[in-house]
From Swiss-Prot:
Single GO biological process annotation from the record: rescue of stalled ribosome
Function of the molecule: Hydrolyzes ribosome-free peptidyl-tRNAs (with 1 or more amino acids incorporated), which drop off the ribosome during protein synthesis, or as a result of ribosome stalling. Catalyzes the release of premature peptidyl moieties from peptidyl-tRNA molecules trapped in stalled 50S ribosomal subunits, and thus maintains levels of free tRNAs and 50S ribosomes.
UniProt keywords, alphabetically: Cytoplasm, Hydrolase, RNA-binding, tRNA-binding
UniProt subcellular location: Cytoplasm
Pfam families given in the database record: Pept_tRNA_hydro (PF01195)
InterPro entries in the record: Pept_tRNA_hydro, Pept_tRNA_hydro_CS, Pept_tRNA_hydro_sf
Protein name: Peptidyl-tRNA hydrolase
Known partners and oligomeric status: Monomer.
Gene responsible for this protein: pth
Matches recorded under CDD domains: PTH (cd00462)
Keyword ATP-binding among record annotations: no
Length: 184
């Protein structure tokens, strides 16, 4: 069993923002597998998919980005999921729009959602997919990540969401290092 968490902020006003690209990836998986989202007792929306016999718990924390770990750790405990079976999908300002990078460990890199998860699961050694959203050319980062993708970037971000979902489906069947080799 795997736990796949897409990071974002709950609420309609954040739905299509750069900061919610993690939600978009797990939404794509739920859509592909035609599985509903249900509110869990761990302050998140949960959907269960099955890929080649491997159960995957998809989660969208409802804690807002900066407290994502408050949802992830209790779900790991409840489902008895080991850290090597956890994968976090989140936005990355340091990658161009549409690029993805897979890693098995690393720091939070200034991402508050990742800081919260590292704090709550007490390790930096877990799988992650970073989805590029680029940096603003000028202006504040906060307004930028809470803004929607412009029309010109839509094809690139849609491709990145689909590629990320493909990588997650592969993770159901092969070790993450093989998935990294294929998609990086």
């Amino acid at each position: 069993m795997k736990l796949i968490a897409g990071l974002g902020n709950p609420g309609k006003k954040y739905e299509r923002t750069r900061h919610n690209v993690g939600f978009m990836v797990v939404d794509e998986l739920s859509f592909r597998h035609q599985t509903p989202w249900k509110k869990s007792k761990f302050n998140g929306m949960v959907s269960e998919i099955n890929v080649g016999g491997e159960k995957m718990i998809l989660v969208k924390p409802l804690t807002f980005m900066n407290a994502s770990g408050e949802c992830i750790r209790p779900l790991m405990d409840y489902y008895n999921i080991q850290v090597e079976d956890v994968l976090i999908v989140y936005d990355d300002l340091d990658l161009p729009v549409g690029k993805i990078r897979l890693r098995q460990k690393g720091s939070a890199g200034g991402h508050n959602g990742m800081k919260s998860i590292i704090q709550h699961i007490k390790t930096q050694e877990f799988n992650r997919i970073r989805v590029g959203v680029s940096r603003p050319l000028k202006g504040e980062v906060i307004n930028y990540v809470l803004g929607d993708f412009p029309k010109a970037e839509q094809p690139d971000i849609i491709a990145a969401i689909q590629k990320s979902a493909d990588a997650i489906e592969d993770f159901a069947q092969v070790p993450f290092v093989e998935v990294m080799n294929k998609y990086n």
